[in-house]
Amino acid sequence: MIYGIGTDICDVRRIRASLERHGDRFAEKVLAEGELATWRARRARWPERGIRFVATRFSAKEAFSKAIGMGMVMPMTWRSCEVIKLPSGQPAIVLHGALKEWFEARNLQVHLSVTDESDYAASFCVVERRA
């Protein structure tokens, strides 16, 4: 049964401006530990790809927060929601702390799709209650 659906479109130029204005602090606020390591590696190889990495994670977390119906309110925090890439290349969400407990108590699962182009990142998220 569908619990919630969320979508988000993120302007990559806004993320670029935030990173220029706030430096690493912006990424450290939005990204979980594993995401930070990936971002730093991508940024070192190709700075523009690092910016798009942050934009896709920002977009995915916004879409997820909408799908669970709470926005960015506890227990939903930027860093308690981590977007990973499975070996197949499929994006997935790993939850931490109180958000993980909240999610598991409701017997929910999440499906995520993420895409990006030069100026925009977009995400679509479906959360369903397990049978």
Swiss-Prot record:
Gene3D superfamilies: 4'-phosphopantetheinyl transferase domain. Its EC number is 2.7.8.7. GO terms for molecular function: holo-[acyl-carrier-protein] synthase activity; magnesium ion binding. GO terms for biological process: fatty acid biosynthetic process. It catalyses: apo-[ACP] + CoA = holo-[ACP] + adenosine 3',5'-bisphosphate + H(+). GO terms for cellular component: cytoplasm. Mg(2+) binds at D8, E62. Its cofactor is Mg(2+). The keyword Cytoplasm applies. Keywords: Cytoplasm, Fatty acid biosynthesis, Fatty acid metabolism, Lipid biosynthesis, Lipid metabolism, Magnesium, Metal-binding, Transferase. It is found in: Cytoplasm. Pfam families: ACPS. InterPro entries: 4-PPantetheinyl_Trfase_dom, 4-PPantetheinyl_Trfase_dom_sf, ACPS, Ppantetheine-prot_Trfase_dom. It is an enzyme of class 2 (transferase). Belongs to the P-Pant transferase superfamily. AcpS family. Transfers the 4'-phosphopantetheine moiety from coenzyme A to a Ser of acyl-carrier-protein. This is Holo-[acyl-carrier-protein] synthase. It comes from Delftia acidovorans (strain DSM 14801 / SPH-1). The gene is acpS.
